[in-house]
């Protein structure tokens, strides 16, 4: 099994190209099931979850082709089965997003209950209840959600609590439903908005994008388009955190700075000099001291849960004490015990991680437990004294494209080993 080996401490310098957002690409790939003609997607990151999604679509009879620029053409005109099997769904929670499109276009869907990261319970009840309100008959049998409907009918649905995948699934179900659907307390994440823009380009009628109330007027059919996936704000934030930790100056390119407003505010509070253009962000931490920052994670546009682990590492080396409170998912401090092995002073109480800054971290063998936790261990390795070996990095490969190559280009001493 692959490991990442990092020789620290590292000084970083230069710029890094940010990939397309995994959390936008996955629902958009599923959304291609709604189109009766081929769709061409660009800026899709080459990640394990994307490969799994393409395999999942292929098992349904979807034709998938890549061109020389690695754009993906998806033709869902001749689907042979409306089932998402356990073998593929178990590795990736986003597979549940096949349910809305299949039910909307074909009136039937059979989707295995999902797997993915080991973070909290993440219930799928909101998806099921929403589709039932739209007229679907749903039963859960032998680990599968089996849904049928003649044609979905528009409904007024309030989602409690806010759910990103729930919003996306019901949005895709609603675009071909008869009449108007209103989704209240909808997630406002940029990735949800990207899916909505994609659906509209295919012929959907969605208004209220970027707000917590989405209104969808059902249409008869959607047709294929060319579409470019938005950049990955969490990948961008991770490289900026690496710059802050290593007291370096790094520019992330091909980003949307407005998607990171809450994060950039915290970098500034931590003592960094942050400058932006239309599509770049530069963080300069040279000759500056890292200050502790208190953080509470909340749905967008507040501070994202997917940047929490990176800021815990920053707080480990900041001058003073700080609290990071996680309100979105359970079990999201699994990286803490590994950071403690590297010399960090962190105490977890419930959903709060309390850190006291230390002078330095020491390299150690550590184990990744989930996607963002594994990124935080790499960041710790970049700044720690000596060798850090991060194992179980298949978690990293689910969400970060070419991570060792990108860090290597910035000057890090990092390589992949078996």
Swiss-Prot record:
Cell cycle found in the keyword field: yes
Instruction: Write down the HAMAP family for this protein, in alphabetical order.
Output: MurA
GO CC, sorted alphabetically, is: cytoplasm
Q: Which residues bind UDP-N-acetyl-alpha-D-glucosamine?
A: 93, 306, 328
Q: Name one GO molecular function term.
A: UDP-N-acetylglucosamine 1-carboxyvinyltransferase activity
A Pfam family annotated for this chain is EPSP_synthase
Q: In which pathway does it act?
A: Cell wall biogenesis; peptidoglycan biosynthesis
- Which residues make up the binding site for phosphoenolpyruvate? 22-23
Which InterPro entries does the entry mention? Enolpyruvate_Tfrase_dom (IPR001986), Enolpyruvate_Tfrase_sf (IPR036968), MurA_subfamily (IPR050068), RNA3'P_cycl/enolpyr_Trfase_a/b (IPR013792), UDP_GlcNAc_COvinyl_MurA (IPR005750)
Protein's UniProt name:
UDP-N-acetylglucosamine 1-carboxyvinyltransferase
Q: Gene3D superfamilies attached here?
A: Enolpyruvate transferase domain (3.65.10.10)
Q: Which residues carry this modification: 2-(S-cysteinyl)pyruvic acid O-phosphothioketal?
A: 117
Q: Where in the cell is it found?
A: Cytoplasm
Keyword presence, Signal: no
Q: What is its EC number?
A: 2.5.1.7
Disulfide-linked positions: none
Task: Print the organism lineage.
Answer: Bacteria, Pseudomonadati, Pseudomonadota, Gammaproteobacteria, Thiotrichales
- Name the gene that codes for it: murA
Regarding protein family, the annotation reads: Belongs to the EPSP synthase family. MurA subfamily.
| Cited function | Cell wall formation. Adds enolpyruvyl to UDP-N-acetylglucosamine.
Cite the active-site annotation: 117 (proton donor)
- To which species is this protein native? Hydrogenovibrio crunogenus (strain DSM 25203 / XCL-2) (Thiomicrospira crunogena)
List the keywords (alphabetical): Cell cycle, Cell division, Cell shape, Cell wall biogenesis/degradation, Cytoplasm, Peptidoglycan synthesis, Pyruvate, Transferase
NCBIfam families attached to this UniProt entry = murA, PRK09369.1
């Amino acid at each position: 099994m692959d490991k990442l080996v990092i020789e620290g401490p590292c000084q970083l310098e230069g710029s890094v190209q940010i990939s397309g957002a995994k959390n936008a690409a996955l629902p958009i790939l599923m959304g291609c099931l709604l189109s009766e003609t081929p769709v061409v997607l660009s800026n899709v990151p080459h990640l394990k979850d994307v490969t799994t999604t393409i395999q999942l679509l292929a098992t349904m009879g979807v034709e998938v082709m890549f061109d020389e620029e690695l754009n993906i053409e998806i033709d869902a005109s001749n689907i042979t089965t409306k089932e998402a099997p356990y073998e593929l769904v178990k590795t990736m929670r986003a597979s549940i997003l096949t349910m809305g499109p299949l039910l909307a276009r074909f009136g039937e869907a059979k989707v295995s209950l999902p797997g993915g990261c080991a973070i909290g319970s993440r219930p799928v009840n909101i998806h099921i209840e929403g589709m039932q309100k739209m007229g679907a008959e749903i039963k859960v049998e032998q680990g599968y959600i089996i849904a049928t409907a003649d044609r979905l009918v528009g409904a007024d649905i309030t989602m409690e609590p806010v759910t990103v995948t729930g919003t996306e699934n019901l949005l895709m179900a609603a675009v071909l439903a008869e009449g108007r659907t209103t989704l209240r307390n909808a997630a406002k994440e940029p990735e949800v908005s990207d899916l909505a823009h994609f659906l509209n380009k295919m012929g959907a009628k969605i208004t209220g994008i970027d707000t917590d109330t989405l209104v969808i007027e059902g249409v008869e059919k959607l047709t294929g388009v060319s579409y470019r996936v938005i950049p990955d704000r969490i990948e961008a934030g991770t490289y900026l955190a690496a710059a802050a930790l290593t007291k370096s100056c790094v520019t992330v390119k091909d980003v949307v700075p407005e998607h990171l407003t809450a994060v950039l505010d915290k970098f500034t509070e931590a003592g960094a000099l942050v400058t932006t253009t239309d599509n770049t962000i530069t963080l300069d931490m040279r000759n500056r001291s890292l200050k502790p920052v208190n953080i509470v994670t909340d749905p967008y546009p507040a501070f994202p849960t997917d940047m929490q682990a990176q800021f815990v590492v920053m707080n480990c080396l900041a001058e003073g004490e700080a609290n990071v409170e996680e309100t979105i998912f359970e079990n999201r401090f699994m990286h803490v015990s590994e950071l403690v092995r590297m010399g960090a002073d962190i105490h977890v109480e419930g959903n709060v991680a309390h850190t006291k800054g230390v002078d330095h971290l020491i390299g150690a063998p550590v184990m990744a437990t989930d996607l963002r936790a594994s990124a935080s261990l790499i960041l710790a390795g970049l700044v720690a004294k000596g060798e850090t070996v991060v194992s179980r990095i298949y978690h990293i490969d689910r969400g970060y494209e070419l991570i060792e190559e990108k860090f290597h280009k910035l000057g890090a001493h990092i390589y992949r080993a078996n």
